[in-house]
Structure formats: structure tokens, C-alpha cells
Swiss-Prot record:
The record's account of how the chain is modified after translation: Disulfide bonds are present.
Transmembrane spans: 68-88
Species for this entry: Mesocricetus auratus
Protein name (Swiss-Prot/TrEMBL): Beta-sarcoglycan
Topological domain spans for side Cytoplasmic: 1-67
Gene coding for it: SGCB
Subunit structure: Cross-link to form 2 major subcomplexes: one consisting of SGCB, SGCD and SGCG and the other consisting of SGCB and SGCD. The association between SGCB and SGCG is particularly strong while SGCA is loosely associated with the other sarcoglycans.
Length: 320
């Protein structure tokens, strides 16, 4: 610093006497001294600090990615909420005058003012679904059955049939007179077909008695196999009893089978041989149907012409 001050004083003395020319070496030394002084003044307040040790502000790294995901998720939820709001607005038809499709009353009544498309309706406890006064309540299924269900009881209305399923039973009342038109409570009411119903289609029926009116016949028809079974026996009574079937008839009992009445067998459907056939020719085995005086039927194999029922092992005993 002293050398710099002396040089400055000498310069001032020389400058007072006029401009002084310096050599190249003196200029280089003076320039180097000025640069050193400038650099020392610049570094006087500088303290080098590592950037990793500085306090970081903002969201960086994983926190930044998580923040971006949260913002995108909130945006998607906002768009979905907007779409749901628009759909509800279009379906319910909310306008300046209120809701055009339904009305809410203080009594808890919800009234639909136009045709409504619904999937499943769950009425609350002790609630009622009905129509307006002097108007019909029309319920339509789009190519699907309409099902009314409460517990195990179910009413299904389809295109070609209506079925009712219940584990307890069912009763049909006249809404005006409250008279029972049809009931499955057989202990209290005798089972009768409703007026206008000509036939009853069931897969299995358990009852004590099946009867018909005095002026009509009782017809039991099945497509496959019919089984009539009684725990204490089966009794069939009628003026005329006819069995028509395409297969076999099997009468099976633990003790006995009693046919009390006139038994007729139509021979038109029984196979018969022509008069020219031989008695034992071919693969045919012929039998003759015989009957005892007490009505017992038995068969006798035909082994020759003009053969009768007088055989030794017939069940009639001495009476033929």
C-alpha cells in the first residue's frame, strides 16, 4: 500500500509539471496492481457455500410428482361430477319453475308427473305405490318380466304367462266386497277353481280328495308319466272311469287291487292274427284271454285250433 501511495504522490508531482509519458513496463505494472486491488475488494464479502446445503423451497422430486397426481385426480373428479350433474339436470328436468318430472310433498309423497323409466323400486316400510284418482297405473317391462316380490312371495308377469310363487300361501279378495275368491288355506277354505278357469296345471299336488262338478267330467291329462299314490290307499269312484294312454298301465298295491264294477276291455286295439295263419308258425306266440266266474282274468297259450280255456292250471278251480 505504501508503494502504491508513493507512486501516486510521484505521479501527482509529475502531473503538476505536465503530462508524463510512461514506459510499457510501468504501464503493465500499474495495470497489474489495479487488477489485484479490484479483485481483493470484490472478494472481501464473498463466502463460498455449497448449494446442496442451502434451504430448498417449493415441491421437488417425489413430492412434486405426487402433487401433480393429486391435481389431475381432482380435475377428473370435477369432470365426472359435472357430467353427473348434467345428466341429473336433463333427466329430472330442473328449470326456473322447479322440477318438471316429479313433485315432493311435505307428507312424504313423491309424485311422478310423466312417464318414468326405472329398474328396481324398493318401497319403504308400510309404503304404497299407486296411481292418480280415476287413472290407471300402467307398469310396462321392456322385453323383460315384471316382478313384484316381498320376502319369499313373488308375482311375475311375463308375455305369455303370469306366475305366483309363495312358501306360505295366497288369497285373492274382491276389493269391493272383501269376499275371498280363491285361497290356498285348505284347512279353512275348500279349494275351488275360480270362475272361468277350466284347467289347473301343476307338477305335483298333495290333497285328500279331487272331485269335479256334478255336471262335468274330471279329466287328468299328462304329457309323460302320471303317478297317483295314496298313503292309505287310492279310491277312484265315478259313473264311468276311462283310462287312455299310449304306454303301459301299472297298478301296484301292497295288499290287493279291487275292481268293483263292470270291467270292459275293447278288443279293437288288441293284436289279432288272420284266419290263414298257422297256430304255431313263425315267431308269433298267441294267447287266449279267459275269465273266471268271479271276474278273475288269466291267459292260456294257444297251441292248437279250437282250443278253449279248460286247462289244468287255471286259477278258477273247478269253475271255468
Amino acid at each position: 500500500m505504501a508503494a502504491a501511495a508513493a507512486a501516486a504522490a510521484a505521479t501527482e508531482q509529475q502531473s503538476s509539471n505536465g503530462p508524463v509519458k510512461k514506459s510499457m513496463r510501468e504501464k503493465a505494472v500499474e495495470r497489474r496492481n489495479v487488477n489485484k486491488e479490484h479483485n481483493s475488494n470484490f472478494k472481501a464479502g464473498y463466502i463460498p457455500i455449497d448449494e446442496d446445503r442451502l434451504h430448498k423451497t417449493g415441491l421437488r422430486g417425489r413430492k412434486g410428482n405426487l402433487a401433480i397426481c393429486v391435481i389431475v385426480l381432482l380435475f377428473i373428479l370435477a369432470v365426472i361430477n359435472l357430467l353427473i350433474t348434467l345428466v341429473i339436470w336433463a333427466v329430472i328436468r330442473i328449470g326456473p319453475n322447479g322440477c318438471d318430472s316429479m313433485e315432493f310433498h311435505e307428507s312424504g309423497l313423491l309424485r311422478f308427473k310423466q312417464v318414468s323409466d326405472m329398474g328396481v323400486i324398493h318401497p319403504l316400510y308400510k309404503s304404497t305405490v299407486g296411481g292418480r284418482r280415476n287413472e290407471n297405473l300402467v307398469i310396462t317391462g321392456n322385453n323383460q318380466p315384471i316382478v313384484f316380490q316381498q320376502g319369499t312371495t313373488k308375482l311375475s308377469v311375463e308375455k305369455n304367462k303370469t306366475s305366483i310363487t309363495s312358501d306360505i300361501g295366497m288369497q285373492f279378495f274382491d276389493p269391493r266386497t272383501q269376499n275371498i275368491l280363491f285361497s290356498t288355506d285348505y284347512e279353512t277354505h275348500e279349494f275351488h277353481l275360480p270362475s272361468g278357469v277350466k284347467s289347473l296345471n301343476v307338477q305335483k299336488a298333495s290333497t285328500e280328495r279331487i272331485t269335479s262338478n256334478a255336471t262335468s267330467d274330471l279329466n287328468i291329462k299328462v304329457d309323460g308319466r302320471a303317478i297317483v299314490r295314496g298313503n292309505e290307499g287310492v279310491f277312484i269312484m265315478g259313473k264311468t272311469i276311462e283310462f287312455h294312454m299310449g304306454g303301459n298301465v301299472e297298478l301296484k298295491a301292497e295288499n290287493s287291487i279291487i275292481l268293483n264294477g263292470t270291467v270292459m276291455v275293447s278288443p279293437t286295439r288288441l293284436p289279432s292274427s288272420s284266419s290263414g295263419d298257422q297256430s304255431g308258425g313263425g315267431d308269433w306266440v298267441r294267447y287266449k284271454l279267459c275269465m273266471c266266474a268271479d271276474g278273475t282274468l288269466f291267459k292260456v297259450q294257444v297251441t292248437g285250433h279250437n282250443m278253449g280255456c279248460q286247462v289244468a292250471d287255471n286259477p278258477c278251480g273247478n269253475t271255468h
